[in-house]
Amino acid sequence: MKITVLGCGALGQLWLSALCKHGHDVQGWLRVPQPYCSVNLIDTDGSFFNESLTANDPDFLAKSELLLVTLKAWQVSDAVRTLASTLPVTSPILLIHNGMGTIEELQNIQQPMLMGTITHAARRDGNIIIHVANGTTHIGPAREQDGDYSYLADILQGVLPDVAWHNNIRAEMWRKLAVNCVINPLTALWNCPNGELRHHTDEINAICEEVAAVIEREGYHTSADDLRYYVEQVIDSTAENISSMLQDVRAMRHTEIDYITGYLLKRARVHGLAVPENSRLFEMVKRKESEYERSGTGMPRPW
C-alpha cells in the first residue's frame, strides 16, 4: 500500500519503520521540506531500524492511498489542509494524536476522515526513537459521512498490532480523553512519571467526576467509578512512562492542553456544566507554557 506519514516524530517514525519492514511503499512528510527523512528506531525486541526514507514528494502524495497523520494536535489542521489538495479525494486521512477537536476544524475536507487513539509508547533519546511498550490502536470514522474503512484496520494490524476498528470511535476517544485529562496535566505540573500519580487520588477523583458528567451529556454512558478504574489501570501499566505533556514541558515546547483539557472545557460550556478542577489544571498548564514561550525558548519542533 502507498502511504504518506505526515509527521516524523516518535510516533511517525514508529509507523514508518513498521510499514517499511512489512513491505509497504512509504514516505515521510516534514514541515521543512527535505528529500529524505531519517528513521532511527529501537523496537521493543531490541531490533534496530535505520533507514533514510523518501520525504515530501508531491508525486508520491498524489498517488498515496492513505495519509497517516501523527502530528501534535495543534499542528494537525493547517498541515492536513495544505496536503489535502494534492491527496486523491478517495484516499482516507487517519488522524492519530492525543486529545479531540481537530475534526471540528477539518469539517470541509473532501477525503474520508478517520481518527484514532494509540497506546504504544515511544520516546526520543537524542536522534534515536525508542519503542518503549507495545499497545493498541483504535480507529474509526470521524464524521457521519465517513464510511467503513475497516479493511485499513486489518492492514495496519499486520504492521503494528493490535489495531481495532470501531464504527463509533467517539466513545473510545472520550475514554482516552479522560485518561489524558488526568495523566497529562498532573504529570506536567508535578514533574513526575505516570506511576507517581497513585499518590494524588483526590485530584484523580475530582477530574473523573467532572469528565464523566460531560461524557454523559455527550450521549455516552459512563460513570466516575468506571473512568477512575480505567485511569488507574493505565497509570499502573505505564508507571515508568513520562507523559507526552511532561516531555513537552521539559523541552519547553507547546503542549496539547488545548485539545485535551481545553476540549473538555469547551464541551462542558456547551452543556452548562462547571468543571472547576479541570479549569484550574488548564490554567496552570497554560501559565507554565506561557512562561517559557514568552521567554522565546518554546520553539515548535519540526514535524
UniProtKB/Swiss-Prot annotation:
Entry GO terms, CC: cytoplasm
Domain of life according to the entry: Bacteria
SUPFAM superfamilies: 6-phosphogluconate dehydrogenase C-terminal domain-like, NAD(P)-binding Rossmann-fold domains
Main localisation: cytoplasm
Pathway: Cofactor biosynthesis; (R)-pantothenate biosynthesis; (R)-pantoate from 3-methyl-2-oxobutanoate: step 2/2
Active-site residues per Swiss-Prot or TrEMBL entry: K176 (proton donor)
Listed InterPro entries: 6-PGluconate_DH-like_C_sf, 6PGD_dom2, ApbA, Ketopantoate_reductase, KPA_reductase, KPR_N, NAD(P)-bd_dom_sf
Cellular localization per UniProt: Cytoplasm
Binding positions (substrate): N98, N180, N184, N194, S244
UniProt KW Nucleotidyltransferase keyword: no
EC number of the protein: 1.1.1.169
Activity across pH: Optimum pH is 6.25.
Pfam families tied to this protein: ApbA, ApbA_C
Record key words, sorted: Cytoplasm, NADP, Oxidoreductase, Pantothenate biosynthesis
GO molecular function list: 2-dehydropantoate 2-reductase activity; NADP binding
Amino-acid positions noted as binding NADP(+) in the UniProt annotation, renumbered to this chain: G7, C8, G9, A10, L11, G12, N98, A122, E256
GO biological process, one term: pantothenate biosynthetic process
Catalysed reaction, written as an equation: (R)-pantoate + NADP(+) = 2-dehydropantoate + NADPH + H(+)
Temperature dependence: Optimum temperature is 42 degrees Celsius.
PANTHER family listed in its UniProt record: 2-DEHYDROPANTOATE 2-REDUCTASE, 2-DEHYDROPANTOATE 2-REDUCTASE-RELATED
Subunit structure: Monomer.
Similarity comment text for this entry: Belongs to the ketopantoate reductase family.
NCBIfam families: apbA_panE (TIGR00745), PRK06522.1-1 (NF005087)
Role of this protein: Catalyzes the NADPH-dependent reduction of ketopantoate into pantoic acid. Has a strong preference for NADPH over NADH as the electron acceptor. Pantoate, ketoisovalerate, oxaloacetate, pyruvate, 3-hydroxypyruvate, alpha-ketoglutarate, alpha-ketobutyrate, and acetaldehyde cannot serve as substrates for reduction.
Protein name (Swiss-Prot/TrEMBL): 2-dehydropantoate 2-reductase
Organism of provenance: Salmonella typhimurium (strain LT2 / SGSC1412 / ATCC 700720)
